């Protein structure tokens, strides 16, 4: 395993493939391994850099408080260490907040930015966000991480044919220390970039699930402010990179290769037949060779 150290953070990361650099940033409660469904498609054309954010995966908690700006600075320090002055960035959920913050910190260094089910502010400024923040924290404190993670996984992947994905998500999130999960959640609830969007110069693609936690209208408004393209994935919930792999990968490749977006009418949640194969395989790792893709020594 490869680690980067500085005075504030110790970051675990993986590097796959060759080509223009591309950073993939996971969401709250996840790790770099969450990108297993995307890496195989992306590493053929790009040098894919996959960090575990502080307090996630194999990365220990930060030495000071959790902040989105601190995460972004830590990733830029990692990229400086790797000799990467300029990179495309894809962020999922909280990872999208970190990606936006990175683009704001060094606007000229992020030519393309992909945001999956992400917003420009997570401050609890309406009742939905307030409820998400407080109920999530309350469940963790009352039930502990493992039980709270199972409820979250059930909400993300409720269909019977999503059993393998649901069990994997519950195991990954349930292994996160409660203090780390709550610290990252608080950092997200305190973060906003809405008043700094004018500083961004990246070409932006937003991928939005039809049934995400937060309203689609808010994402459409953000896309308008960013002059971004937006792909709406019908039938998908918050875990779009998991439940709509084909739509996610094709859309990201269109952004990264400056190609037109595919016809959006075809993008629906991956069909049950495909997901049933996941369940029969017994685990996501077997079906998509997660171990082969993400557990090799860095090249």
Q: What spans do the regions from the language model cover?
A:
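Flexible "cap/lid" loop of the alpha/beta hydrolase fold
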Residues: 104-105, 111-141
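Conserved alpha/beta-hydrolase catalytic His-Asp/Glu region
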Residues: 124-129, 143-199
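Active-site loop/oxyanion-hole signature of alpha/beta-hydrolase fold enzymes
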Residues: 40, 49-90
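Short beta-strand/loop motif that positions the catalytic acidic residue
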Residues: 200, 206-208
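Conserved alpha/beta-hydrolase "acid-adjacent" motif
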Residues: 213-219
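Conserved HGGG/HGGXW glycine-rich cap/lid loop of the alpha/beta-hydrolase fold
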Residues: 9-60
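Alpha/beta-hydrolase fold catalytic core
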Residues: 1-22, 44-46, 85, 253-299
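Catalytic histidine-centered segment of alpha/beta-hydrolase-like enzymes
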Residues: 236-249, 265-268
């Amino acid at each position: 395993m490869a680690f980067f150290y500085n005075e504030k953070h110790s970051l675990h990361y993986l590097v796959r493939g060759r080509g223009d650099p591309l950073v993939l940033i996971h969401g709250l409660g996840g790790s770099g391994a969450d990108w297993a469904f995307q890496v195989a498609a992306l590493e053929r054309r790009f040098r894919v850099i996959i960090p575990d954010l502080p307090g996630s995966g194999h990365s220990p908690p930060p030495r000071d408080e959790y902040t989105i700006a601190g995460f972004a600075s830590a990733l830029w320090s990692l990229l400086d260490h790797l000799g990467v002055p300029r990179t495309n960035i894809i962020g999922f959920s909280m990872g999208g907040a970190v990606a936006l913050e990175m683009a704001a910190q060094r606007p000229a260094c992020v030519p393309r930015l992909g945001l999956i089910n992400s917003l420009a502010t997570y401050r609890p400024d309406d009742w939905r966000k307030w409820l998400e923040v407080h109920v999530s924290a309350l469940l963790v404190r009352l039930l502990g991480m493992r039980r709270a993670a199972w409820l979250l996984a059930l909400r993300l992947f409720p269909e019977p044919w999503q059993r393998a994905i649901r069990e994997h998500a519950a195991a990954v999130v349930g292994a996160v220390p409660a203090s780390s999960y709550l610290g990252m959640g608080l950092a997200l609830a305190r973060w906003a970039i809405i008043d700094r969007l004018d500083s961004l110069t990246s070409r932006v693609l937003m991928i939005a699930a039809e049934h995400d936690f937060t309203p689609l209208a808010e994402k459409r408004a953000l896309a308008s402010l960013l002059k971004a393209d937006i792909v709406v994935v019908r039938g998908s919930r918050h875990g779009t990179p998991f439940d709509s792999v084909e739509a996610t990968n094709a859309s990201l490749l269109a952004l990264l290769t400056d190609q037109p977006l595919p016809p959006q009418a075809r993008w629906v949640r991956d069909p049950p037949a495909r997901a049933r194969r996941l369940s029969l395989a017994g685990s996501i790792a077997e079906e998509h060779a997660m171990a082969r893709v993400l557990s090799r020594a860095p090249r």
